[in-house]
């Protein structure tokens, strides 16, 4: 294809070209032979040339092959053929597993021509009859090496192969010089023909990773059937043959396991001693530290950005607040100025009103009316706004004395009417408030039933059921309904209203209620007069005896009593005497009486709570 003409160049056509003609060409001779091979084998001509080159190279190697004489050949025991070196017997000790089948056949042919019994006999050499002649070893060698399966079995246990694994200390200084030959030597067992090399110190991470991945997943063809102790062909029956096969499989599996452990040990040792692995780990560590540092720096920058944004927001909020405060301050100053101006204007208008009325003698003829009008004028000054004052002053200035007087009296009348309305509204509100308080203090329809006994019972119930009790006021109402002798049924609302009323009472009323309650208590608990009955009177724990203390129980005495009840259980001998000793100032009867009261209070409390709970369930 012609290139594009550049600037200044000229394209010239000299002649025309004839059109292409399609013709059919058939191969003949050696080209026809190559065509058939390519078609039948699906290979190219270059591949055929490579095959021919390989065949030529093998023929050249066969021609150049020099056999090595085995000095121990004539001393070999034909019966111990399994332990002989077959390659050495055929003179291929220096080639071994690399020898081709042509080389093996050529070596066998040379050995037969030289060591055949007939040849030696013709030369006058003494021959051992039968299979005891050393020539049998040559026959066994060609039998093993010419069979691919048997040869592989022998190659697997090649006596010249070095199974040693270098230690980590050996490869620490010269890693590549120590381990490279070992891996190349063991690579002969690989099923895969192509395997990665150990490489150098400059090898990339991918190459090193591929190398160790190959060896950690190493697939070996090495097998140990050549070392079978028993041959199944020698078995006399099927069962014996099966037993021999089982024993051979077990021994082969054990040796295979040991071989794979050896390979794994080799790879682990090399991996741990490989300086490249250490370098890669350090690089990876440095990379992670760098990434971590980058993340920390990024996070730090993000925090700084957030902090900067927050400060900007705070600064903006502060400026806005200052602006608002400044605007509010200015507005307040303006309002203050307006208020001051209004005050001055009102003061001026009030002064003008006073001066106008004073100059007209308050539009009256006698002293009494003058005083009254002075009060009315002051009332107008206090009640009227600026506009009303200005309007009134204009009316007083514009008209004559009679008109001014009429305008003043009209304004006074309007202000007095407004004051009267306000007083009436306030009076109605006070009456409504007093009526509400009276209704609340009365406690509804049952106000007439609150006797001194009910009041004391209410106070007792409020103390018995403190704040926090579930459905407290319903419980208190039930307690009063159970223990009141008035017969009036109380609701929770009645109890709440009465409790609030008692809280609003002044101290004198509370003292009076407490005094009446104490007098009633003293009257009910007065000592029983002596009788003429000489019999032993029964004990009453609710009456005040000669050795009893009628004073109310204090909090400290109550705590001492509760602790004594816990300390001395029911099984204690002379329990109440010991309890009374633990409570100073209280006798045995006082303690027993107090205990009885506490039991009754607890029972009543539980009964009231159960009643409320049952009512709530319904």
Swiss-Prot record:
It comes from the Eukaryota. It is found in: Nucleus; Cytoplasm, Cytosol. GO terms for molecular function: chromatin binding; histone binding; Hsp70 protein binding; ribosome binding; ubiquitin-modified histone reader activity. The keyword Transcription applies. The keyword Endoplasmic reticulum does not apply. Coiled coil: none annotated. This is DnaJ homolog subfamily C member 2. The lineage of its organism: Eukaryota, Metazoa, Chordata, Craniata, Vertebrata.
């Amino acid at each position: 294809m012609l290139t594009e003409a550049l600037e200044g160049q000229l394209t010239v056509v000299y002649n025309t070209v004839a059109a292409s003609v399609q013709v059919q060409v058939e191969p003949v001779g050696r080209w026809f032979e190559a065509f058939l091979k390519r078609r039948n084998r699906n290979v190219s001509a270059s591949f055929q040339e490579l095959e021919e080159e390989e065949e030529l190279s093998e023929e050249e190697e066969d021609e150049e092959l020099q056999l090595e004489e085995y000095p121990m050949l004539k001393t070999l025991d034909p019966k111990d053929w399994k332990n002989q070196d077959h390659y050495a017997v055929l003179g291929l000790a220096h080639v071994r597993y690399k020898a081709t089948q042509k080389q093996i056949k050529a070596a066998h042919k040379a050995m037969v021509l030289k060591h055949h019994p007939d040849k030696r006999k013709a030369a006058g050499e003494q021959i051992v009859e039968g299979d005891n002649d050393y020539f049998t070893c040559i026959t066994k060698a060609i039998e093993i090496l010419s069979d691919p399966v048997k040869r592989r079995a022998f190659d697997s246990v090649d006596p010249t192969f070095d199974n040693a694994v270098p230690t980590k200390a050996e490869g620490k200084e010269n890693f590549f010089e120590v381990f490279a030959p070992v891996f190349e030597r063991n690579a002969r067992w690989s099923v895969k023909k192509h395997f990665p090399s150990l490489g150098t110190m400059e090898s990339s991470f991918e190459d090193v990773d591929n190398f160790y991945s190959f060896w950690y997943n190493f697939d070996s063809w090495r097998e140990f059937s050549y070392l079978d102790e028993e041959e199944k062909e020698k078995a006399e029956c099927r069962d014996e043959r099966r037993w021999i096969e089982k024993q051979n499989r077990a021994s082969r599996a054990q040796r295979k396991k040991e071989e794979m452990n050896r390979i794994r040990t080799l790879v682990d040792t090399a991996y741990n001693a490989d300086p490249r692995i250490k370098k890669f780990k350090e690089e990876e560590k440095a990379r992670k530290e760098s990434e971590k540092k980058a993340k920390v720096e990024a996070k730090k920058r993000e925090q700084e950005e957030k902090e900067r944004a927050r400060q900007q927001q705070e600064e903006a909020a502060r400026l806005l607040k200052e602006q608002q405060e400044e605007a509010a301050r200015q507005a307040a100053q303006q309002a203050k100025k307006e208020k001051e101006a209004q005050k001055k204007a009102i003061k001026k208008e009030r002064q003008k009103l006073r001066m106008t009325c004073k100059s007209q003698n308050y539009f009256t003829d006698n002293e009494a009316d003058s005083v009254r009008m002075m009060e009315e004028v002051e009332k107008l000054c206090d009640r009227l706004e600026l506009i009303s004052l200005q309007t009134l002053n204009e009316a007083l200035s514009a008209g004559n004395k009679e008109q001014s007087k009429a305008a003043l009296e009209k304004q006074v009348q309007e202000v007095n009417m407004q004051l009267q309305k306000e007083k009436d509204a306030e009076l109605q509100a006070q009456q409504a408030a007093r009526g509400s308080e009276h209704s609340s203090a009365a406690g509804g329809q049952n106000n007439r039933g609150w006797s001194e006994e009910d009041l004391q019972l209410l106070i007792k119930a409020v103390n018995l059921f403190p704040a926090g009790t579930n459905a407290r006021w319903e419980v208190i109402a039930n307690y009063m309904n159970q223990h009141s002798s008035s017969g009036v049924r109380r609701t929770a609302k009645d109890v709440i209203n009465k409790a609030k009323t008692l809280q609003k009472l002044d101290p004198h009323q509370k003292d009076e209620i407490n005094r009446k309650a104490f007098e009633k208590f003293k009257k009910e608990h007065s000592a029983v007069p002596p009788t003429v009955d000489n019999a032993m009177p029964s004990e009453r724990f609710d009456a005040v005896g000669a050795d009893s203390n009628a004073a109310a129980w204090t909090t400290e005495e109550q705590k001492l009593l509760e602790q004594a009840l816990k300390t001395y259980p029911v099984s204690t001998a002379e329990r109440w005497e010991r309890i009374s000793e633990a409570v100073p100032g209280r006798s045995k009867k006082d303690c027993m009486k107090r205990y009885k009261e506490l039991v009754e209070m607890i029972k009543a409390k539980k009964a009231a709570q159960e009643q409320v709970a049952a009512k709530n369930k319904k």
